[in-house]
Protein backbone atom coordinates (compact mmCIF):
# COMPACT_ATOMS: atom_id res chain seq x y z
CA UNK A 1 0.00 0.00 0.00
CA UNK A 2 2.83 2.42 0.80
CA UNK A 3 4.43 1.58 -2.54
CA UNK A 4 1.16 2.43 -4.32
CA UNK A 5 0.95 5.70 -2.39
CA UNK A 6 4.50 6.52 -3.42
CA UNK A 7 3.71 5.75 -7.05
CA UNK A 8 0.63 8.01 -6.81
CA UNK A 9 2.74 10.79 -5.33
CA UNK A 10 5.37 10.31 -8.02
CA UNK A 11 2.67 10.58 -10.70
CA UNK A 12 1.32 13.70 -8.99
CA UNK A 13 4.80 15.21 -8.97
CA UNK A 14 5.20 14.35 -12.66
CA UNK A 15 1.86 15.96 -13.50
CA UNK A 16 2.76 19.02 -11.44
CA UNK A 17 6.09 19.24 -13.25
CA UNK A 18 4.33 18.98 -16.61
CA UNK A 19 1.88 21.69 -15.57
CA UNK A 20 4.78 23.89 -14.47
CA UNK A 21 6.49 23.35 -17.82
CA UNK A 22 3.25 24.19 -19.61
CA UNK A 23 2.94 27.33 -17.50
CA UNK A 24 6.51 28.20 -18.43
CA UNK A 25 5.72 27.75 -22.12
CA UNK A 26 2.59 29.87 -21.70
CA UNK A 27 4.70 32.51 -20.00
CA UNK A 28 7.17 32.45 -22.89
CA UNK A 29 4.30 32.77 -25.39
CA UNK A 30 2.91 35.72 -23.48
CA UNK A 31 6.38 37.23 -23.34
CA UNK A 32 6.63 36.93 -27.12
CA UNK A 33 3.16 38.42 -27.43
CA UNK A 34 4.24 41.27 -25.19
CA UNK A 35 7.24 41.89 -27.39
CA UNK A 36 5.02 41.87 -30.45
CA UNK A 37 2.71 44.34 -28.76
CA UNK A 38 5.68 46.55 -28.02
CA UNK A 39 6.70 46.37 -31.66
CA UNK A 40 3.20 47.45 -32.64
CA UNK A 41 3.54 50.26 -30.11
CA UNK A 42 6.72 51.49 -31.74
CA UNK A 43 5.23 51.22 -35.25
CA UNK A 44 2.25 53.43 -34.48
CA UNK A 45 2.31 56.38 -32.07
CA UNK A 46 -1.42 56.87 -32.39
CA UNK A 47 -2.06 53.51 -30.68
CA UNK A 48 0.44 54.11 -27.86
CA UNK A 49 -2.12 54.43 -25.11
CA UNK A 50 -3.93 51.31 -26.18
CA UNK A 51 -0.69 49.32 -26.40
CA UNK A 52 0.42 50.51 -22.98
CA UNK A 53 -2.91 49.39 -21.58
CA UNK A 54 -2.47 45.99 -23.19
CA UNK A 55 1.09 45.81 -21.88
CA UNK A 56 -0.15 46.49 -18.37
CA UNK A 57 -2.82 43.86 -18.82
CA UNK A 58 -0.19 41.37 -20.05
CA UNK A 59 2.00 42.35 -17.12
CA UNK A 60 -0.79 41.61 -14.66
CA UNK A 61 -1.50 38.28 -16.37
CA UNK A 62 2.22 37.47 -16.24
CA UNK A 63 2.40 38.35 -12.54
CA UNK A 64 -0.62 36.13 -11.90
CA UNK A 65 1.07 33.25 -13.73
CA UNK A 66 4.25 33.82 -11.73
CA UNK A 67 2.18 33.67 -8.54
CA UNK A 68 0.56 30.43 -9.74
CA UNK A 69 4.01 28.99 -10.46
CA UNK A 70 5.08 29.93 -6.93
CA UNK A 71 1.99 28.17 -5.57
CA UNK A 72 2.77 25.07 -7.64
CA UNK A 73 6.35 25.16 -6.41
CA UNK A 74 5.14 25.27 -2.81
CA UNK A 75 2.83 22.34 -3.52
CA UNK A 76 5.75 20.43 -5.02
CA UNK A 77 7.80 21.16 -1.90
CA UNK A 78 4.91 19.91 0.28
CA UNK A 79 4.65 16.72 -1.76
CA UNK A 80 8.42 16.26 -1.52
CA UNK A 81 8.18 16.61 2.25
CA UNK A 82 5.34 14.06 2.27
CA UNK A 83 7.56 11.71 0.26
CA UNK A 84 10.34 12.14 2.82
CA UNK A 85 7.86 11.42 5.63
CA UNK A 86 6.67 8.28 3.82
CA UNK A 87 10.29 7.20 3.47
CA UNK A 88 10.84 7.64 7.22
CA UNK A 89 7.65 5.69 7.98
CA UNK A 90 8.87 2.91 5.69
CA UNK A 91 12.16 2.75 7.58
CA UNK A 92 10.32 2.67 10.94
CA UNK A 93 8.04 -0.14 9.69
CA UNK A 94 11.09 -2.04 8.46
CA UNK A 95 12.72 -1.81 11.90
CA UNK A 96 9.47 -2.90 13.58
CA UNK A 97 9.11 -5.90 11.26
CA UNK A 98 12.72 -6.88 11.91
CA UNK A 99 12.22 -6.67 15.69
CA UNK A 100 9.01 -8.75 15.49
CA UNK A 101 10.76 -11.36 13.37
CA UNK A 102 13.63 -11.55 15.87
CA UNK A 103 11.16 -12.04 18.75
CA UNK A 104 9.32 -14.80 16.88
CA UNK A 105 12.58 -16.47 15.98
CA UNK A 106 13.76 -16.37 19.60
CA UNK A 107 10.48 -17.94 20.76
CA UNK A 108 10.85 -20.73 18.20
CA UNK A 109 14.44 -21.32 19.30
CA UNK A 110 13.30 -21.66 22.91
CA UNK A 111 10.59 -24.13 21.87
CA UNK A 112 13.14 -26.10 19.86
CA UNK A 113 15.52 -26.25 22.84
CA UNK A 114 12.71 -27.44 25.12
CA UNK A 115 11.75 -30.19 22.64
CA UNK A 116 15.39 -31.18 22.35
CA UNK A 117 15.69 -31.52 26.14
CA UNK A 118 12.54 -33.65 26.28
CA UNK A 119 13.84 -35.83 23.46
CA UNK A 120 17.16 -36.33 25.25
CA UNK A 121 15.30 -37.29 28.43
CA UNK A 122 13.18 -39.83 26.56
CA UNK A 123 16.26 -41.33 24.91
CA UNK A 124 17.89 -41.74 28.34
CA UNK A 125 14.76 -43.42 29.69
CA UNK A 126 14.73 -45.72 26.69
CA UNK A 127 18.38 -46.61 27.29
CA UNK A 128 17.56 -47.46 30.92
CA UNK A 129 14.68 -49.68 29.80
CA UNK A 130 16.94 -51.42 27.30
CA UNK A 131 19.50 -52.02 30.06
CA UNK A 132 16.79 -53.59 32.22
CA UNK A 133 15.75 -55.78 29.31
CA UNK A 134 19.34 -56.93 28.84
CA UNK A 135 19.52 -57.86 32.53
CA UNK A 136 16.27 -59.80 32.27
CA UNK A 137 17.55 -61.65 29.24
CA UNK A 138 20.76 -62.50 31.06
CA UNK A 139 18.67 -63.95 33.90
CA UNK A 140 16.62 -65.87 31.33
CA UNK A 141 19.80 -67.34 29.83
CA UNK A 142 21.00 -68.42 33.29
CA UNK A 143 17.61 -70.00 33.99
CA UNK A 144 17.79 -71.74 30.64
CA UNK A 145 21.17 -73.25 31.45
CA UNK A 146 19.93 -74.43 34.82
CA UNK A 147 16.87 -75.96 33.22
CA UNK A 148 19.07 -77.75 30.68
CA UNK A 149 21.17 -79.23 33.48
CA UNK A 150 18.06 -80.34 35.32
CA UNK A 151 16.69 -81.78 32.12
CA UNK A 152 19.87 -83.73 31.54
CA UNK A 153 19.61 -85.16 35.07
CA UNK A 154 16.00 -86.04 34.41
CA UNK A 155 16.95 -87.75 31.17
CA UNK A 156 19.59 -89.77 32.95
CA UNK A 157 17.13 -90.86 35.62
CA UNK A 158 14.52 -91.71 33.00
CA UNK A 159 17.04 -93.74 31.03
CA UNK A 160 18.04 -95.63 34.19
CA UNK A 161 14.41 -96.30 35.04
CA UNK A 162 13.72 -97.42 31.49
CA UNK A 163 16.64 -99.86 31.53
CA UNK A 164 15.21 -101.35 34.69
CA UNK A 165 11.70 -101.54 33.31
CA UNK A 166 12.40 -102.66 29.73
CA UNK A 167 12.13 -106.30 30.49
CA UNK A 168 9.06 -105.97 32.69
CA UNK A 169 6.48 -103.50 31.35
CA UNK A 170 5.66 -102.99 27.67
CA UNK A 171 3.61 -100.00 28.58
CA UNK A 172 6.66 -98.43 30.18
CA UNK A 173 8.48 -98.85 26.85
CA UNK A 174 5.70 -96.98 25.12
CA UNK A 175 6.05 -94.35 27.84
CA UNK A 176 9.77 -94.12 27.12
CA UNK A 177 9.06 -93.67 23.41
CA UNK A 178 6.58 -90.95 24.22
CA UNK A 179 9.07 -89.34 26.59
CA UNK A 180 11.64 -89.34 23.78
CA UNK A 181 9.13 -87.64 21.52
CA UNK A 182 8.50 -85.17 24.29
CA UNK A 183 12.23 -84.53 24.63
CA UNK A 184 12.54 -84.03 20.88
CA UNK A 185 9.71 -81.51 20.87
CA UNK A 186 11.26 -79.84 23.90
CA UNK A 187 14.55 -79.58 22.01
CA UNK A 188 12.72 -78.04 19.09
CA UNK A 189 11.08 -75.56 21.43
CA UNK A 190 14.49 -74.86 22.96
CA UNK A 191 15.92 -74.26 19.48
CA UNK A 192 13.05 -71.90 18.64
CA UNK A 193 13.69 -70.06 21.89
CA UNK A 194 17.39 -69.77 21.08
CA UNK A 195 16.49 -68.41 17.67
CA UNK A 196 14.16 -65.87 19.30
CA UNK A 197 16.94 -64.82 21.68
CA UNK A 198 19.35 -64.44 18.75
CA UNK A 199 16.82 -62.32 16.91
CA UNK A 200 16.35 -60.24 20.06
CA UNK A 201 20.10 -59.65 20.24
CA UNK A 202 20.14 -58.65 16.60
CA UNK A 203 17.26 -56.27 17.31
CA UNK A 204 19.27 -54.79 20.17
CA UNK A 205 22.21 -54.19 17.85
CA UNK A 206 20.00 -52.55 15.28
CA UNK A 207 18.35 -50.46 17.98
CA UNK A 208 21.77 -49.30 19.17
CA UNK A 209 22.76 -48.33 15.65
CA UNK A 210 19.44 -46.54 15.31
CA UNK A 211 20.12 -44.63 18.53
CA UNK A 212 23.53 -43.64 17.21
CA UNK A 213 21.91 -42.47 13.99
CA UNK A 214 19.38 -40.45 16.01
CA UNK A 215 22.19 -38.80 17.99
CA UNK A 216 23.96 -37.98 14.73
CA UNK A 217 20.75 -36.50 13.35
CA UNK A 218 20.41 -34.40 16.50
CA UNK A 219 23.99 -33.14 16.13
CA UNK A 220 23.38 -32.28 12.49
CA UNK A 221 20.16 -30.54 13.44
CA UNK A 222 22.04 -28.54 16.09
CA UNK A 223 24.70 -27.57 13.53
CA UNK A 224 21.92 -26.54 11.16
CA UNK A 225 20.39 -24.40 13.91
CA UNK A 226 23.80 -22.77 14.56
CA UNK A 227 24.22 -22.05 10.85
CA UNK A 228 20.72 -20.61 10.71
CA UNK A 229 21.38 -18.35 13.70
CA UNK A 230 24.65 -17.23 12.11
CA UNK A 231 22.80 -16.40 8.88
CA UNK A 232 20.15 -14.51 10.84
CA UNK A 233 22.83 -12.56 12.69
CA UNK A 234 24.49 -11.61 9.41
CA UNK A 235 21.07 -10.70 8.02
CA UNK A 236 20.49 -8.38 11.02
CA UNK A 237 23.90 -6.83 10.51
CA UNK A 238 23.04 -6.37 6.86
CA UNK A 239 19.74 -4.70 7.80
CA UNK A 240 21.61 -2.38 10.20
CA UNK A 241 24.08 -1.51 7.49
CA UNK A 242 21.20 -0.77 5.10
CA UNK A 243 19.52 1.46 7.73
CA UNK A 244 22.79 3.30 8.42
CA UNK A 245 23.56 3.74 4.73
CA UNK A 246 20.48 6.00 4.34
CA UNK A 247 22.24 8.77 6.31
CA UNK A 248 25.19 9.07 3.97
CA UNK A 249 24.14 9.52 0.37
CA UNK A 250 27.66 10.37 -0.75
CA UNK A 251 28.93 6.84 0.08
CA UNK A 252 25.68 5.08 -0.87
CA UNK A 253 26.94 3.58 -4.13
CA UNK A 254 30.05 1.99 -2.59
CA UNK A 255 28.03 0.71 0.35
CA UNK A 256 25.39 -0.65 -2.02
CA UNK A 257 27.98 -2.64 -3.97
CA UNK A 258 29.45 -4.00 -0.78
CA UNK A 259 26.00 -4.95 0.50
CA UNK A 260 25.16 -6.65 -2.79
CA UNK A 261 28.37 -8.69 -2.52
CA UNK A 262 27.43 -9.57 1.04
CA UNK A 263 23.94 -10.57 -0.12
CA UNK A 264 25.44 -12.86 -2.75
CA UNK A 265 27.66 -14.42 -0.09
CA UNK A 266 24.64 -14.97 2.16
CA UNK A 267 22.75 -16.53 -0.74
CA UNK A 268 25.67 -18.92 -1.31
CA UNK A 269 25.65 -19.83 2.38
CA UNK A 270 21.90 -20.35 2.19
CA UNK A 271 22.36 -22.70 -0.78
CA UNK A 272 24.99 -24.60 1.19
CA UNK A 273 22.57 -24.85 4.11
CA UNK A 274 19.91 -26.14 1.71
CA UNK A 275 22.30 -28.85 0.48
CA UNK A 276 23.00 -29.79 4.12
CA UNK A 277 19.28 -30.04 4.75
CA UNK A 278 18.92 -32.31 1.71
CA UNK A 279 21.68 -34.57 3.07
CA UNK A 280 19.89 -34.58 6.42
CA UNK A 281 16.65 -35.55 4.71
CA UNK A 282 18.44 -38.41 2.87
CA UNK A 283 19.81 -39.71 6.16
CA UNK A 284 16.37 -39.43 7.70
CA UNK A 285 14.89 -41.49 4.86
CA UNK A 286 17.59 -44.13 5.35
CA UNK A 287 16.79 -44.20 9.06
CA UNK A 288 13.10 -44.60 8.24
CA UNK A 289 13.94 -47.58 6.01
CA UNK A 290 15.95 -49.10 8.85
CA UNK A 291 13.00 -48.61 11.19
CA UNK A 292 10.71 -50.33 8.69
CA UNK A 293 13.18 -53.22 8.50
CA UNK A 294 13.29 -53.39 12.30
CA UNK A 295 9.50 -53.41 12.42
CA UNK A 296 9.44 -56.30 9.95
CA UNK A 297 11.94 -58.19 12.09
CA UNK A 298 9.87 -57.49 15.19
CA UNK A 299 6.84 -58.87 13.38
CA UNK A 300 8.83 -61.98 12.50
CA UNK A 301 9.93 -62.25 16.12
CA UNK A 302 6.31 -62.02 17.24
CA UNK A 303 5.41 -64.77 14.78
CA UNK A 304 8.20 -66.94 16.18
CA UNK A 305 6.99 -66.21 19.72
CA UNK A 306 3.49 -67.23 18.66
CA UNK A 307 4.84 -70.46 17.25
CA UNK A 308 6.72 -71.05 20.50
CA UNK A 309 3.51 -70.48 22.46
CA UNK A 310 1.71 -72.97 20.23
CA UNK A 311 4.50 -75.48 20.80
CA UNK A 312 4.27 -74.85 24.55
CA UNK A 313 0.54 -75.47 24.50
CA UNK A 314 1.09 -78.67 22.56
CA UNK A 315 3.71 -79.73 25.10
CA UNK A 316 1.24 -78.99 27.90
CA UNK A 317 -1.36 -81.14 26.20
CA UNK A 318 1.20 -83.92 25.80
CA UNK A 319 2.16 -83.43 29.42
CA UNK A 320 -1.46 -83.91 30.44
CA UNK A 321 -1.59 -87.05 28.31
CA UNK A 322 1.58 -88.28 29.99
CA UNK A 323 0.04 -87.60 33.38
CA UNK A 324 -3.01 -89.61 32.43
CA UNK A 325 -0.83 -92.45 31.18
CA UNK A 326 1.28 -92.29 34.33
CA UNK A 327 -1.85 -92.56 36.41
CA UNK A 328 -2.84 -95.63 34.41
CA UNK A 329 0.65 -97.05 34.83
CA UNK A 330 0.62 -96.24 38.53
CA UNK A 331 -2.26 -98.67 39.11
CA UNK A 332 -0.24 -101.51 37.52
CA UNK A 333 3.25 -100.95 38.88
CA UNK A 334 2.49 -98.86 41.97
CA UNK A 335 4.19 -101.25 44.36
CA UNK A 336 7.47 -101.51 42.40
CA UNK A 337 8.01 -98.08 40.86
CA UNK A 338 6.26 -95.78 43.35
CA UNK A 339 9.42 -93.91 44.26
CA UNK A 340 10.48 -93.48 40.62
CA UNK A 341 7.03 -92.25 39.60
CA UNK A 342 6.98 -89.75 42.48
CA UNK A 343 10.36 -88.42 41.37
CA UNK A 344 9.12 -88.18 37.79
CA UNK A 345 6.00 -86.34 38.92
CA UNK A 346 8.12 -83.92 40.92
CA UNK A 347 10.40 -83.33 37.93
CA UNK A 348 7.40 -82.87 35.64
CA UNK A 349 5.86 -80.38 38.08
CA UNK A 350 9.15 -78.52 38.25
CA UNK A 351 9.32 -78.55 34.45
CA UNK A 352 5.79 -77.16 34.27
CA UNK A 353 6.72 -74.39 36.66
CA UNK A 354 9.76 -73.60 34.55
CA UNK A 355 7.60 -73.55 31.43
CA UNK A 356 5.17 -71.19 33.11
CA UNK A 357 8.05 -68.97 34.25
CA UNK A 358 9.44 -68.99 30.73
CA UNK A 359 6.00 -68.07 29.36
CA UNK A 360 5.81 -65.15 31.81
CA UNK A 361 9.30 -63.99 30.84
CA UNK A 362 8.38 -64.25 27.16
CA UNK A 363 5.21 -62.23 27.77
CA UNK A 364 7.24 -59.61 29.66
CA UNK A 365 9.77 -59.52 26.82
CA UNK A 366 6.99 -59.06 24.25
CA UNK A 367 5.49 -56.29 26.36
CA UNK A 368 8.89 -54.60 26.63
CA UNK A 369 9.37 -54.94 22.87
CA UNK A 370 6.00 -53.31 22.25
CA UNK A 371 6.81 -50.51 24.67
CA UNK A 372 10.19 -50.04 23.01
CA UNK A 373 8.54 -49.97 19.60
CA UNK A 374 6.09 -47.33 20.84
CA UNK A 375 8.97 -45.25 22.20
CA UNK A 376 10.78 -45.53 18.87
CA UNK A 377 7.68 -44.37 17.01
CA UNK A 378 7.38 -41.37 19.33
CA UNK A 379 11.06 -40.55 18.82
CA UNK A 380 10.72 -40.72 15.06
CA UNK A 381 7.61 -38.55 15.19
CA UNK A 382 9.60 -36.00 17.19
CA UNK A 383 12.45 -36.20 14.68
CA UNK A 384 9.91 -35.62 11.90
CA UNK A 385 8.55 -32.60 13.80
CA UNK A 386 12.07 -31.23 14.17
CA UNK A 387 12.68 -31.67 10.44
CA UNK A 388 9.38 -29.95 9.67
CA UNK A 389 10.30 -27.07 12.01
CA UNK A 390 13.67 -26.81 10.26
CA UNK A 391 11.87 -26.57 6.90
CA UNK A 392 9.59 -23.88 8.34
CA UNK A 393 12.64 -21.95 9.64
CA UNK A 394 14.20 -22.24 6.20
CA UNK A 395 11.03 -20.98 4.50
CA UNK A 396 10.78 -18.09 6.95
CA UNK A 397 14.42 -17.21 6.30
CA UNK A 398 13.77 -17.15 2.55
CA UNK A 399 10.68 -14.96 3.08
CA UNK A 400 12.69 -12.62 5.32
CA UNK A 401 15.43 -12.34 2.68
CA UNK A 402 12.85 -11.63 -0.03
CA UNK A 403 11.16 -9.05 2.21
CA UNK A 404 14.51 -7.43 2.94
CA UNK A 405 15.30 -7.24 -0.79
CA UNK A 406 11.87 -5.75 -1.46
CA UNK A 407 12.34 -3.15 1.29
CA UNK A 408 15.77 -2.36 -0.11
CA UNK A 409 14.31 -1.84 -3.58
CA UNK A 410 11.53 0.33 -2.15
CA UNK A 411 14.11 2.38 -0.25
CA UNK A 412 16.19 2.85 -3.39
CA UNK A 413 13.09 3.81 -5.40
CA UNK A 414 12.08 6.30 -2.71
CA UNK A 415 15.57 7.81 -2.76
CA UNK A 416 15.48 8.03 -6.55
CA UNK A 417 12.05 9.67 -6.42
CA UNK A 418 13.28 12.11 -3.80
CA UNK A 419 16.35 12.89 -5.94
CA UNK A 420 14.21 13.44 -9.03
CA UNK A 421 11.76 15.58 -7.04
CA UNK A 422 14.64 17.68 -5.66
CA UNK A 423 16.06 18.13 -9.16
CA UNK A 424 12.63 19.12 -10.52
CA UNK A 425 12.13 21.51 -7.62
CA UNK A 426 15.54 23.13 -8.19
CA UNK A 427 14.83 23.40 -11.92
CA UNK A 428 11.42 24.95 -11.31
CA UNK A 429 12.95 27.30 -8.74
CA UNK A 430 15.56 28.42 -11.27
CA UNK A 431 12.89 28.90 -13.95
CA UNK A 432 10.69 30.78 -11.50
CA UNK A 433 13.60 33.01 -10.50
CA UNK A 434 14.38 33.69 -14.17
CA UNK A 435 10.72 34.38 -14.90
CA UNK A 436 10.47 36.66 -11.86
CA UNK A 437 13.60 38.51 -12.86
CA UNK A 438 12.36 38.85 -16.45
CA UNK A 439 8.97 40.01 -15.20
CA UNK A 440 10.55 42.61 -12.97
CA UNK A 441 12.72 43.82 -15.86
CA UNK A 442 9.74 43.99 -18.16
CA UNK A 443 7.74 45.78 -15.49
CA UNK A 444 10.46 48.39 -15.11
CA UNK A 445 10.82 48.79 -18.85
CA UNK A 446 7.05 49.04 -19.37
CA UNK A 447 6.81 51.67 -16.62
CA UNK A 448 9.67 53.65 -18.12
CA UNK A 449 8.24 53.29 -21.61
CA UNK A 450 4.86 54.42 -20.35
CA UNK A 451 6.32 57.50 -18.68
CA UNK A 452 8.44 58.41 -21.71
CA UNK A 453 5.59 57.97 -24.12
CA UNK A 454 3.44 60.24 -22.00
CA UNK A 455 6.11 62.93 -22.23
CA UNK A 456 6.52 62.26 -25.97
CA UNK A 457 10.24 61.54 -25.88
CA UNK A 458 12.23 60.17 -28.85
CA UNK A 459 12.77 56.43 -29.40
CA UNK A 460 16.25 55.12 -30.28
CA UNK A 461 18.28 51.92 -30.24
CA UNK A 462 21.46 51.09 -28.34
CA UNK A 463 23.46 47.96 -27.69
CA UNK A 464 23.51 46.38 -24.22
CA UNK A 465 26.40 44.51 -22.60
CA UNK A 466 24.74 41.21 -23.52
CA UNK A 467 25.17 42.01 -27.22
CA UNK A 468 21.45 42.49 -27.80
CA UNK A 469 20.11 45.78 -29.19
CA UNK A 470 17.90 47.78 -26.85
CA UNK A 471 15.13 50.25 -27.65
CA UNK A 472 15.73 53.59 -25.87
CA UNK A 473 12.95 56.03 -25.21
CA UNK A 474 14.70 58.95 -23.46
CA UNK A 475 16.65 56.79 -21.04
CA UNK A 476 14.32 53.73 -20.91
CA UNK A 477 15.57 50.60 -22.61
CA UNK A 478 13.84 47.38 -23.73
CA UNK A 479 16.11 44.44 -24.56
CA UNK A 480 15.29 42.61 -27.79
CA UNK A 481 16.31 39.17 -28.96
CA UNK A 482 18.76 38.66 -31.84
CA UNK A 483 16.00 37.17 -33.99
CA UNK A 484 13.86 40.30 -33.73
CA UNK A 485 16.67 42.88 -34.17
CA UNK A 486 16.45 43.31 -37.91
CA UNK A 487 12.66 43.68 -38.03
CA UNK A 488 12.58 46.06 -35.08
CA UNK A 489 15.37 48.23 -36.60
CA UNK A 490 13.50 48.60 -39.84
CA UNK A 491 10.30 49.52 -38.02
CA UNK A 492 12.04 52.13 -35.92
CA UNK A 493 13.81 53.62 -38.93
CA UNK A 494 10.45 54.06 -40.57
CA UNK A 495 9.10 55.67 -37.43
CA UNK A 496 12.01 58.12 -36.76
CA UNK A 497 11.66 60.51 -39.79
CA UNK A 498 8.23 61.79 -38.74
CA UNK A 499 9.64 62.44 -35.27
CA UNK A 500 12.53 64.47 -36.65
CA UNK A 501 10.11 66.46 -38.80
Swiss-Prot record:
Keyword Nucleotide-binding: yes
Keywords: Actin-binding, ATP-binding, Coiled coil, Cytoplasm, Motor protein, Muscle protein, Myosin, Nucleotide-binding, Thick filament
Pfam families (UniProt xref): Myosin_tail_1
Biased composition (Polar residues): 492-501
Cell compartments where the protein resides: Cytoplasm, Myofibril
Cellular component terms per the entry's GO annotation: bicellular tight junction; myofibril; myosin complex; myosin filament
Entry annotated with the keyword Nucleotide-binding: yes
Stretch list, region Disordered: 182-202, 221-254, 397-501
InterPro entries hit by this protein: Myosin_tail
Coiled coil location: 1-457
Gene Ontology MF term list: actin binding; ATP binding
Basic and acidic residues biased stretches: 223-233
Function noted in UniProt: Muscle contraction.
Domain remark in the UniProt entry: The rodlike tail sequence is highly repetitive, showing cycles of a 28-residue repeat pattern composed of 4 heptapeptides, characteristic for alpha-helical coiled coils. Limited proteolysis of myosin heavy chain produces 1 light meromyosin (LMM) and 1 heavy meromyosin (HMM). HMM can be further cleaved into 2 globular subfragments (S1) and 1 rod-shaped subfragment (S2).
Oligomer and partners: Muscle myosin is a hexameric protein that consists of 2 heavy chain subunits (MHC), 2 alkali light chain subunits (MLC) and 2 regulatory light chain subunits (MLC-2).
Listed name of the protein: Myosin heavy chain, embryonic smooth muscle isoform
Organism: Oryctolagus cuniculus
